Structure formats: C-alpha cells, structure tokens
Amino acid sequence: MSITSLKNQKEFELINKLGKKLHERYFILVIATKLPKIFLESKYNTFLGIKVSRKLNKKAVVRNKIKRRIRHLIRIIVSDSSFKDIKFAMIIIPRKGFEEINFSHLNYELSKLILRNI
C-alpha cells in the first residue's frame, strides 16, 4: 500500500469539495472515495493531507510532532490488507487535546472512522 501527500492548495480544495466530513472529539476527517482523474491515474492508492493550525499550538516543534504522529497512524491503518485495492484521499485536521491523547486510542478512533466510510 503506497501513500503520498496532497501537494498543493488545489488538491486540498478538491478533496474538501468531494469528501465527506466526519467529526470526532480529537480530529476532523475529510475522506473522499470518488476521486477525480488526476488521482486515479496515479500509482499511489492513498492520498493524505494534514492541516495543523497555529491555534492548536504556537510552537512549530509541537505541530510537527502532531504531523509525524498522524503519518505514523495512517501507515499503520493503511498497511492492513483490507485497503489493498481501494483508492481514497483524506485530510486530517487535529483538534485541541490531540497531542495529549494516547496513541492507541487515536489509532482505534481513526481506524474505526476510516473503515466505516470506505
């Protein structure tokens, strides 16, 4: 399973428009399974965008740590065999409290949301 990031504002806007917004306590997930031609022709199956606002934390070090945690979570979830032939794109927007919650709880919540909506 190969993962790549959303590269520019146009891709983010496209996923925001086509995707379904799902709200959880610690994050917002925008997930799109019906992808435009640009994404379908790609060799990658999963497209990931992460938006970490300055409102969440003023320090760039903390915001980067949050991004690393999210990327690692997605790698774990997508490595599951149930995602083998599915192409989808998602944007994850963490909320306040995301950095304090433990990793296993985040993994459970995020995987539950993704599996339910693919």
From Swiss-Prot:
PROSITE patterns: RIBONUCLEASE_P. GO terms for biological process: tRNA 5'-leader removal. GO terms for cellular component: ribonuclease P complex. It catalyses: Endonucleolytic cleavage of RNA, removing 5'-extranucleotides from tRNA precursor. GO terms for molecular function: 3'-tRNA processing endoribonuclease activity; ribonuclease P activity; tRNA binding. Disulfide bonds: none annotated. It holds the Pfam family Ribonuclease_P. Gene3D superfamilies: 3.30.230.10. Its EC number is 3.1.26.5. Keywords: Endonuclease, Hydrolase, Nuclease, RNA-binding, tRNA processing. Transmembrane segments: none annotated. Belongs to the RnpA family. This is Ribonuclease P protein component. It comes from Rickettsia rickettsii (strain Sheila Smith).
